[in-house]
Each structure stands twice: as structure tokens, then as C-alpha cells.
Regions:
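Extracytoplasmic ligand-binding site segments that recognize negatively charged/polar headgroups
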Residues: 163-165, 178-192, 196, 226-254, ...
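Structured C-terminal subdomain patch of bacterial secreted/periplasmic proteins
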Residues: 96, 189-190, 195-198, 204, ...
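A short, structured surface patch at a secondary-structure boundary
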Residues: 60-62, 70-74, 78, 96-150, ...
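Extracytoplasmic/secreted envelope proteins and their assembly/folding machinery
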Residues: 91-95, 101, 105-106, 144, ...
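Short, solvent-exposed loop/turn elements at domain surfaces
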Residues: 88-91, 105-110, 125-129, 239-244, ...
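Bacterial Sec-exported substrate-binding components of ABC uptake systems
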Residues: 2-103, 201-233, 352-355
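Proline-aspartate-enriched helix->loop->beta-strand connector
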Residues: 143-160, 175, 279-292
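His/Asp/Glu-enriched short active-site or ligand-binding loop at hydrolase and phosphoryl-transfer sites
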Residues: 246-274
Length: 355
């Protein structure tokens, strides 16, 4: 793990933008940038065109990937395999799957197993997880009682550190359980989920499609000369609803890496949705582009809330040039099958900045 930049150490956020600057920015909220990158999706993952109810601040860019791949998988159980914790597990019944993370739900849906998804985390943004029949909270405060009380037949976690113990508890209760290793690329995650349910060939097909998209994204930006663009991805979905910087192990980090750019969060040694940053630290990292999700912008209540959440970003190179990209939250925050399509859209938008 990279050494954490001391300037990114955690502290309380403080306000501090000139009123004139905020007023000017808010006035620009009335129109959208005409040159924004707009790609709508006709896939089963829904319409990814810019939300009609959301008007982006002037100069900001809507970036959305299209052509999200799917594959038709066949359920073949029982299966005995090694999961992400290194344990040999047997899966016999997948009629009601409890997913430990929405990325697992997204992958299941892309493999044609949407109807098997029974319960998902309450804070999900992925469509397949949001539409699950049941939702649950799982944290240090809630413990595992609520999770274990769900009448599922299979638990699939997405993080050995977070879900290894939960999976063991499920097995003790007679419920099948397996965990995906979250530290592997998206292709490995897809193959793991498909293998758990008995169709590794379908997993290879879907993973291959996403991996080819990531290669395509890299090719778009490979010809770009000069320094690697620095991208800062921010969210309103940190622990306890805190504002956070996206670091290692996130969908945004994988997309940024595929584009040949530098993730500010990863470079600072941050992992997941991290609150371990300072306003001054973000300013010193001099991001060329700021990236966030449409759900985050909505949660902040628009531009004014965003400026209060990250008061120094307007003073960064990205802020001064209005190089702020907004993506569908389902693409920027879910390490699922949309990562490749999102990376292509992001690469095209970055390429446009370099011309």
C-alpha cells in the first residue's frame, strides 16, 4: 500500500470560499455545458443519459458509458470451490441470494440471475441491488443479527476482511456462503461469482467483454502526450454519510487507472471511501479533473452543497477550469460490469480535454 501523504491526514472540513465565487458558480447552474460528453445506454442496466431532473452547473460535463455487456449463464449446482478467503466452500442452493455488496448484485444481474437476488445492502445504488425484495444494514453498530435473520439460502460477500466472519456464521447456521476477493480486478470478481453458481464459461465470456472495454479505454488515452492527468474522485457516501475521497479498491480507481490517469486518492494511499483527508491536502494535490456521481450531487443539494463539502476544490486547477465530470453513480461507485463502459466514456472525455 502506498505511503499516505501527511497532508491528507483527517480533520474536520471547514468552509472558506469567497462569496463572490460561490455566487458566480451558482448563477452558472442554470445551464449545462454544451460540449458535455453524453452517451445513453440501451442496456438492461437502464437509461444512463443525463437525468432530466438534474441541471449540471455551467461547464460541468456529464460522462456516461454505454454498451454494458451481459451474458446468459446457467445455474449448475452443487458446486465446490475455493472462495476469496481461501476456504473450500460448497454451494447447493441459490434460490434466495443475500449479497454482501451491490457489485455482486450487479454481476449476478448481468449473468441473467437477477431473480435470484433476495437481499442487498440498504445504501445501494446499483439497480439490481436497489430492486432486491429485502434490504439490510450491516456495520459495527448494527452487528450481524439483522443480516443473519434474513431467510436466504446463500450469502455472497464481496470483501474477505468484512464478510469472512459473516460467511462463517451463515455456514454455522446451515446457510451456504462464499466471499469474493475484492482486491482483484473486475474480471476476477465476475469469474468468481459465475463459478460460485456453476457456470465459469459464462463468467469468462462476461469478464472478457469488460476487460476488452478496459483495453479500449487505455488505447484512447495512450496517444495523449504530456503528464498523466490527476483525477480526484469525491463522494457523499463515506462512513456515516460523511464526505469522502475515493481511493484504492473502488470502481472509480479502476476506471482512472484504465485511462492512464492518476487517482489522487490512490496516490495519497487512501482506500475505499476515505475521510482521511484535509482541504489543504486536496488543494496541494492539484487535481486536473474532479469526478463525482449524480447521486452525490443530488445528496449535496447541487453546487452550493458541493462547495461547502469541499471548499478548496474551486481553487484547484480542475476547479478553476471547471473540469468537473459527473457520472452515473451506478458506474462510478459500483465495481461491476459497467466499469469498462464507464472507463471508455471517461477516456473520451479526458482525451477531449487534452486537445
Amino acid at each position: 500500500m502506498p505511503h499516505m501523504d501527511p497532508a491528507i491526514a483527517r480533520r474536520t472540513l471547514v468552509a472558506g470560499l469567497p462569496v463572490a465565487l460561490i455566487s458566480s458558480c451558482l448563477a452558472g447552474c442554470r445551464s449545462q455545458r454544451q460540449s458535455a460528453v453524453r452517451e445513453s445506454s440501451s442496456s438492461s442496466h437502464g437509461n444512463l443519459s443525463a437525468p432530466a431532473a438534474m441541471r449540471l452547473p455551467q461547464g460541468w460535463t456529464w460522462v456516461a458509458g454505454s454498451d454494458i455487456p451481459v451474458a446468459k449463464a446457467t445455474l449448475r449446482l452443487p458446486v465446490t470451490t475455493t472462495d476469496g478467503t481461501g476456504r473450500r466452500v460448497t454451494i447447493k442452493n441459490a434460490n434466495r441470494i443475500i449479497v454482501g455488496g451491490e457489485d455482486v448484485a450487479d454481476i449476478l444481474a448481468a449473468l441473467g440471475w437477477r431473480k435470484l437476488i433476495y437481499a442487498a445492502p440498504t445504501n445501494s445504488v446499483a439497480e439490481a441491488a436497489v430492486n432486491a425484495p429485502k434490504h439490510y444494514g450491516f456495520s459495527k453498530k448494527t452487528g450481524m443479527e439483522g443480516l443473519l435473520s434474513i431467510d436466504g439460502t446463500l450469502f455472497i460477500g464481496n470483501n474477505p476482511m468484512r464478510h469472512g466472519r459473516a460467511a462463517a456464521k451463515f455456514r454455522e447456521a446451515g446457510v451456504d456462503a462464499a466471499v469474493v476477493n475484492d482486491r482483484q480486478p473486475i474480471g476476477g470478481k465476475i469469474r468468481a461469482v459465475a463459478t460460485f453458481l456453476g457456470d465459469p464459461k459464462a463468467g469468462d465470456k462476461l469478464a472478457g467483454a469488460v476487460e476488452r472495454q478496459l483495453v479500449e479505454a487505455a488505447a484512447i488515452t495512450r496517444a495523449r502526450q504530456g503528464h498523466r492527468l490527476r483525477i480526484l474522485a469525491v463522494t457523499a457516501s463515506g462512513a456515516g454519510g460523511a464526505n469522502a475521497v475515493m481511493g484504492m479498491g473502488t470502481a472509480s480507481a479502476e476506471m482512472i487507472a484504465a485511462c492512464g490517469a492518476t487517482s489522487v486518492g490512490v496516490r495519497a494511499g487512501l482506500r475505499g471511501y476515505s475521510v482521511k483527508f484535509t482541504d489543504e491536502g486536496l488543494l496541494s494535490m492539484k487535481p486536473d479533473v474532479i469526478l463525482t456521481g449524480d447521486g452525490d450531487l443530488k445528496r449535496w443539494g447541487g453546487l452550493e452543497g458541493y462547495l461547502k463539502a469541499f471548499p478548496t476544490l474551486a481553487q484547484t486547477p480542475a476547479g478553476r477550469k471547471n473540469h468537473v465530470f459527473v457520472m452515473p453513480s451506478e458506474q462510478i461507485k459500483v465495481s461491476g460490469v459497467g466499469v469498462g463502459a464507464g472507463a471508455i466514456a471517461l477516456a473520451r472525455a479526458l482525451d477531449a480535454l487534452s486537445r
